[in-house]
Amino acid sequence: MSYWILEFIRVGIGYIFLMYLWPSVVFRKHLSGKSLTYRFAFCSTVSVLLINTLVLSLGLFHILDGRIVFFLFYGIFIASILKEKRLRLRVSGQLRKLFAGKLGWKSFLTALADDSKYLLVTFFRRLNQKIKGRRLEYGILSVLILFAIAYFSYGAFQNHSYGWGDMYVHHAWIYGLKEGNIFSAGVYPEAMHCFIYSMDVLFGISIYSCLLFLGEIHVATLLVAVYCLFREILKSRYTVYLILAAFLTIDVVCIDEIYGMARLQYTIPQEFGLYTLFLCTLYLIRFLKRETKGFDGNLFLFMTSLAASLAIHFYVTIMAFFLCASFAVFGLNQIFRKKNFGVLVTAVILGVVISTLPMVLAFASGIPLQGSLNWGMNIINGTDTKEGRSQAVQTSTGESTEAMTGITAEKSSENASSLPSQSQLDSQQGTVIEMESSTNVPKTPLVKRVADAVIRSLKLVYQYGYLQLYGRSRAGWLLRFTIIAAILTLVNVVISIVRLKKISFSMYAGITTASFLFMLLYAAPFLGLPEIIAGARLCLPEQILLLAMMAIPADELFFLLEKTKAGHFAPQISLAGVLAIYAGTNYFGVFHGYLYYELTRYN
């Protein structure tokens, strides 16, 4: 076990260096004076894009080699550090003494360690100044993150083996990068693979250990992204702790929900990129709420988040589109303003170009598309993706073909002979038309037909979405909270009109719409709509959105509390709320169990 603990620590250190420390040092002038949220979003998106672009570009020129990547990354890092004049003079002075024989190796290394210690102390002092007055809040967030990492790492430490069959495929693709071959199985978003390849090259961490532990560690980035989004859009900054606590403790009852949660244990592209879904939405909202013109920092981070999502996995980009649309629909007037529309379109185009250019060039050079990218054709043809449910839905509703039901060819011919001929059907249809025309049945008004269609669709979404995923009892509670959220949204709109004489950009409406829209996407096959994303893949973000929607009443209470003298105790109350959720889930027997691990092979 000690070996695996050491490997876990190595993966964690490599991840922190590559994802956060390297860009923080190299781009420190740009990040100087920026908020912690900006720094987090910048580092977690720009680092992925730079690594992806560098590795794939070297591969396109057939010069991808670990030694080149090693010298480029460490060379840029060291050169950036030595840009500081005082540090450069000190290091050069120490080196001159070392080579002149005036300083021994031990003394040189001791001086280097002292300098590193000084830099670390300075960093933590600055960080302490940043979080001054909010230590309890960040303490709660840190505990939740550590809890999540421990929970999602449990399976890997128990089995020391990949928990999902697809991980062996991704292992092979990363090994292809080690051999200098990009897109070894065809053109496919490879940002995650390039990231793990770089960890292997820069730190000597095996691909196996990276794939085994990176996904669980990367959960921290997902939770921080969720934290940043809901801290921005909710009225109180303390409500988000309740959302995260509920997400990490409450059990799920449907196999699709369990599958969605279990995927966070695995290092696979979609889950690696889920954090960009929330960052895209965060910076689009900030962009729409701004008063300035031009291409600002908010739009830049929206662009990098969009580009990172495309570079990691296309499903994440599709989810980001629907989540952004849920909020943007309530700010259409801001989108189509002259000062916003042009730069927003430019940012989207740049994001798409940055992320897809290596893939487009690889495809143009003759590398074929990877097979899973045919999902678009599957939708057009009405056939299933690997995890799709379209044909299963047809089977359950009586629309399946004889091939789907396994009926033999002989039985098929017997059934065919018993069916009426086409001429008989035409005759019967003509008779029915004549009867209808002779009886003069009044036509149903268009409004009523539309209303009936909407009601029928809502019932199907409830039946094949809420009920199927959460059961009758929980689905009932979700419906009640959705109604409460809608009422609170209307109340806030009325207050905004009365006080500000305008309709404000409604965040509550966006949360409620997003939770329903993702449920609609899940139930799409049952409504006769194409299954754009495999239903089980939607369950994780949907769970977060539903919990956020249910937290809207608590957010209002926190907001009102902060307007009173008792508002000083809001952090302590949020801590009590987190503890109450943990205790309550255990007391009522709804605390989550351990997630399943699919052992296709055992180490």
Roles of regions detected by a PLM:
Residues 6-22, 271-277, 433-499, 542-543, ...:
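Alpha-helical transmembrane segments at the extracellular/periplasmic loop-to-helix junctions
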Residues 298-314:
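Membrane-interface alpha helices of multi-pass inner-membrane proteins
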Residues 127-275, 541, 598-602:
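Active-site lumenal/periplasmic loops and adjacent helix-entry segments of GT-C-fold
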Residues 60-69, 157-167, 182, 204, ...:
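Membrane-helix boundary/interfacial segments in multi-pass membrane proteins
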Residues 344-355, 556-593:
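Signature aromatic-anchored transmembrane alpha helix within multi-pass, membrane-resident enzymes
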Residues 126-135, 238-239, 291-296, 334-345, ...:
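Membrane-interface helix-loop-helix junctions at transmembrane boundaries of multi-pass membrane enzymes
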Residues 1-131:
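Membrane-embedded, hydrophobic transmembrane alpha-helices
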Residues 319-353:
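Perimembrane helix-loop-helix junctions
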